[in-house]
């Protein structure tokens, strides 16, 4: 099929890939860690004290509105001849209210984005979310999946977000994630990210068994690089498109020398988009 599905990863730098996939149309998909998109109202149920007008960060209404405008501009900048991205996955949003204010920003209001979001048990009060264009993605349902890591039963972190529907005549499932950070030590926290990856792999396997034709896109801040154990071994991702099966997961960033952020003068690619094999069978990038 001569169709194209465009995935764009937007973080500290912009990474784009164009995949031959399905419809005679382009569908833009992006992930963006917006880093602390909080409103200015104190929520006693979460630790948002640093993101208030009188806090050390002086998170005022003006700064909040400025950030909304910046995030909207980033989304708008990914527009192409087919318009705004069809799907925008986000990490580190405080609540639905900030998303409702984001989608009416003048830069993107004409996209008429719909919202998928659930409050998570994360201690910082940050969640993942997904915006989508209903004229491109017909959503049949969405749900939050609570993270369950056996080695850390009291872990309070971001839920996984699953959104399923139809795009370009194809059945789709989007999974938005934000794995636990490396704070406390890479090795000391690795089991948390591996536990998350195990759960995602189980979800993928169950979907593949029930509906082998459904195409899967996993995207988010995984706080690990594509060659780290959680992604390479636990998710069992492949770095080449040759001989992919519908049950395989492909990482387009497995061989890249650049990344999505820089720390200690070193590139990291913690922000990832991973695709099911049935999106790439018979193609070469």
Residue spans of the language-model regions?
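Active-site His/acidic residue clusters
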Residues: 45-48, 170, 174-189
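Active-site-proximal beta-strand elements of phosphoester/diester hydrolases
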Residues: 28-36, 56, 141-143, 171-181
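Bacterial N-terminal signal peptides
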Residues: 7-18
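Metal-dependent phosphoester-hydrolase catalytic domains
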Residues: 206-216, 224-285
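N-terminal, active-site-proximal structural segment of metallo-dependent hydrolase catalytic domains
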Residues: 22-106, 112, 116-128
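Catalytic metal-binding/acid-base residues of hydrolase active sites
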Residues: 35, 94, 180, 222-225, ...
């Amino acid at each position: 099929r001569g169709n194209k599905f465009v995935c764009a990863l937007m973080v500290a730098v912009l990474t784009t890939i164009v995949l031959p996939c399905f419809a005679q149309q382009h569908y833009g998909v992006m992930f963006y860690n917006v880093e602390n998109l909080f409103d200015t109202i104190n929520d006693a149920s979460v630790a948002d004290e640093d993101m208030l007008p009188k806090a050390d960060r002086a998170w005022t209404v003006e700064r909040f509105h400025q950030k909304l405008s910046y995030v909207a501009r980033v989304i708008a900048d990914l527009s192409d001849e087919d318009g705004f991205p069809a799907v925008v996955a986000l990490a580190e949003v405080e609540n639905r209210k900030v998303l409702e204010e984001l989608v009416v920003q003048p830069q993107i209001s004409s996209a008429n984005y719909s919202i998928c979001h659930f409050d998570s048990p994360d201690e910082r009060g940050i969640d993942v979310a997904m915006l989508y264009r209903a004229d491109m993605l017909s959503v049949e349902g969405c749900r939050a999946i609570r993270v369950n890591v056996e080695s850390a039963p009291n872990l309070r972190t971001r839920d996984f977000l699953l959104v399923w529907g139809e795009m370009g005549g194809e059945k789709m499932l989007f999974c938005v994630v934000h794995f636990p950070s490396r704070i406390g030590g890479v090795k000391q926290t690795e089991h948390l990210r591996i536990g998350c990856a195990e759960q995602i792999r189980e979800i993928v396997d169950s979907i593949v068994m029930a509906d082998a034709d459904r195409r899967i896109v996993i995207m988010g801040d995984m706080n690990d690089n594509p060659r780290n154990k959680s992604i390479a071994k636990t998710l069992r991702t492949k770095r080449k498109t040759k001989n992919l099966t519908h049950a395989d997961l492909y990482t387009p960033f497995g061989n890249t020398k650049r990344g999505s952020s820089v720390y200690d003068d070193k590139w990291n690619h913690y922000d990832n988009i991973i695709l099911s094999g049935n999106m790439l069978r018979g193609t070469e990038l």
